[in-house]
């Protein structure tokens, strides 16, 4: 799913049907659903964030944000992607986000991303912890439990 900020709204591509939806910034924490397929916009699948909207989403989200910094050329990143997507489906209480480090160098630099994949957990806009490397499903669950619960 891709999120793009437009004035006080964000354009969000549905992670299920890929139709673009306009969501008011103040509704980021509501159970916003796709106008086309009716499925949740912010639960069940990772949300693609960019340099343009990363800070806005972190500031507006009342849910903890789990960010995966990755790149398309990175083999371990590609291998970890299904594990991350499955975790997003299991944990609607968190906002799972993906940031392509090649397409978004500014936020990658601000977050001091030195290796990929790197996961960073945020609560109320503040980084709580980070871990680098492709994790198994069990390792990811253990890390989430230790950091966010």
Task: Identify the function of each model-found stretch.
Residues 14-17, 34-37:
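Short cysteine-rich clusters marking metal-coordination/redox-active sites
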Residues 21, 41, 81:
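Cys/His-rich microdomains that often coordinate metals
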Residues 46-64:
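A short beta-strand-turn-helix
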